[in-house]
Protein backbone atom coordinates (compact mmCIF):
# COMPACT_ATOMS: atom_id res chain seq x y z
CA UNK A 1 0.00 0.00 0.00
CA UNK A 2 0.78 3.65 0.40
CA UNK A 3 3.05 3.27 3.43
CA UNK A 4 4.99 0.46 1.80
CA UNK A 5 5.56 2.61 -1.27
CA UNK A 6 6.99 5.40 0.89
CA UNK A 7 9.14 2.94 2.79
CA UNK A 8 10.44 1.54 -0.49
CA UNK A 9 11.31 5.03 -1.73
CA UNK A 10 13.06 5.79 1.54
CA UNK A 11 15.02 2.54 1.27
CA UNK A 12 16.09 3.47 -2.25
CA UNK A 13 17.17 6.91 -1.03
CA UNK A 14 19.14 5.64 1.96
CA UNK A 15 20.84 2.89 -0.07
CA UNK A 16 21.82 5.27 -2.87
CA UNK A 17 22.91 7.95 -0.38
CA UNK A 18 25.15 5.48 1.47
CA UNK A 19 26.65 4.33 -1.85
CA UNK A 20 27.34 7.94 -2.90
CA UNK A 21 29.05 8.58 0.43
CA UNK A 22 31.12 5.41 0.22
CA UNK A 23 32.14 6.40 -3.29
CA UNK A 24 32.95 9.89 -1.96
CA UNK A 25 35.23 8.23 0.60
CA UNK A 26 37.46 7.28 -2.29
CA UNK A 27 36.99 10.28 -4.58
CA UNK A 28 35.66 12.98 -2.30
CA UNK A 29 32.67 15.30 -2.54
CA UNK A 30 32.17 19.05 -2.60
CA UNK A 31 30.28 21.28 -0.21
CA UNK A 32 28.68 24.56 -1.28
CA UNK A 33 27.61 27.03 1.38
CA UNK A 34 26.83 30.73 0.96
CA UNK A 35 28.04 30.54 -2.62
CA UNK A 36 31.44 29.13 -1.67
CA UNK A 37 32.47 25.63 -2.70
CA UNK A 38 35.08 23.56 -0.91
CA UNK A 39 36.06 19.91 -0.95
CA UNK A 40 34.40 17.77 1.68
CA UNK A 41 36.44 15.48 3.87
CA UNK A 42 35.31 11.80 3.55
CA UNK A 43 34.97 11.54 7.35
CA UNK A 44 32.65 14.54 7.39
CA UNK A 45 30.68 13.03 4.54
CA UNK A 46 30.28 9.77 6.49
CA UNK A 47 29.28 11.59 9.69
CA UNK A 48 26.61 13.49 7.79
CA UNK A 49 25.30 10.28 6.23
CA UNK A 50 25.08 8.57 9.63
CA UNK A 51 23.32 11.58 11.13
CA UNK A 52 20.73 11.76 8.35
CA UNK A 53 20.15 8.01 8.13
CA UNK A 54 19.85 7.67 11.92
CA UNK A 55 17.02 10.24 11.83
CA UNK A 56 14.98 7.80 9.76
CA UNK A 57 12.31 8.58 7.21
CA UNK A 58 10.87 12.04 7.64
CA UNK A 59 7.70 13.53 6.23
CA UNK A 60 7.82 13.57 2.43
CA UNK A 61 7.18 17.08 1.09
CA UNK A 62 5.92 18.22 -2.33
CA UNK A 63 8.05 21.37 -2.55
CA UNK A 64 11.32 22.58 -1.13
CA UNK A 65 11.99 25.69 0.96
CA UNK A 66 13.08 29.10 -0.28
CA UNK A 67 16.60 30.31 0.28
CA UNK A 68 20.05 28.93 -0.34
CA UNK A 69 20.58 25.37 0.81
CA UNK A 70 23.77 23.82 2.03
CA UNK A 71 24.70 21.55 -0.88
CA UNK A 72 26.85 18.44 -1.04
CA UNK A 73 27.67 17.15 -4.52
CA UNK A 74 28.85 13.57 -4.82
CA UNK A 75 30.90 12.23 -7.70
CA UNK A 76 28.19 9.62 -8.28
CA UNK A 77 26.19 12.53 -9.70
CA UNK A 78 23.90 12.65 -6.68
CA UNK A 79 23.24 15.96 -4.93
CA UNK A 80 22.17 16.52 -1.33
CA UNK A 81 20.56 19.86 -0.41
CA UNK A 82 19.84 20.77 3.21
CA UNK A 83 17.81 23.64 4.62
CA UNK A 84 16.95 24.63 8.16
CA UNK A 85 13.15 24.72 8.43
CA UNK A 86 10.42 25.29 10.96
CA UNK A 87 8.38 22.18 11.71
CA UNK A 88 4.79 23.32 12.23
CA UNK A 89 3.35 20.07 13.63
CA UNK A 90 2.49 20.27 17.31
CA UNK A 91 3.69 16.70 17.77
CA UNK A 92 7.17 17.63 16.52
CA UNK A 93 10.07 16.88 18.82
CA UNK A 94 11.62 20.24 17.92
CA UNK A 95 10.16 23.47 16.46
CA UNK A 96 12.92 23.47 13.85
CA UNK A 97 14.45 20.72 11.81
CA UNK A 98 16.16 19.95 8.56
CA UNK A 99 14.68 19.70 5.09
CA UNK A 100 16.51 17.09 3.03
CA UNK A 101 16.40 17.01 -0.76
CA UNK A 102 18.32 14.21 -2.42
CA UNK A 103 18.63 14.18 -6.19
CA UNK A 104 19.64 10.82 -7.63
CA UNK A 105 22.14 10.73 -10.48
CA UNK A 106 19.19 10.03 -12.82
CA UNK A 107 17.45 13.23 -11.72
CA UNK A 108 14.84 11.60 -9.46
CA UNK A 109 14.21 13.68 -6.34
CA UNK A 110 13.41 12.41 -2.86
CA UNK A 111 12.67 15.16 -0.35
CA UNK A 112 11.37 15.31 3.20
CA UNK A 113 11.67 17.24 6.42
CA UNK A 114 12.58 15.83 9.82
CA UNK A 115 12.55 17.19 13.36
CA UNK A 116 14.96 14.45 14.46
CA UNK A 117 18.04 16.45 13.48
CA UNK A 118 18.97 20.10 13.71
CA UNK A 119 21.03 22.23 11.36
CA UNK A 120 23.68 22.80 14.04
CA UNK A 121 24.19 19.00 14.16
CA UNK A 122 24.62 19.03 10.38
CA UNK A 123 27.21 21.81 10.66
CA UNK A 124 29.02 19.93 13.43
CA UNK A 125 29.06 16.72 11.36
CA UNK A 126 30.52 18.68 8.45
CA UNK A 127 33.05 20.43 10.67
CA UNK A 128 31.57 23.86 9.94
CA UNK A 129 31.31 26.64 12.46
Predicted regions and their residues:
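Function-determining sites in protein domains
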Residues: 1-129
Amino acid sequence: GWAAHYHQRYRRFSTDFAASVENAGKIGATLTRNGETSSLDPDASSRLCRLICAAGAGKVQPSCPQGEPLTVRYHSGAVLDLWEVEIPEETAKNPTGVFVRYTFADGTVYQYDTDQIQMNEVRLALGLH
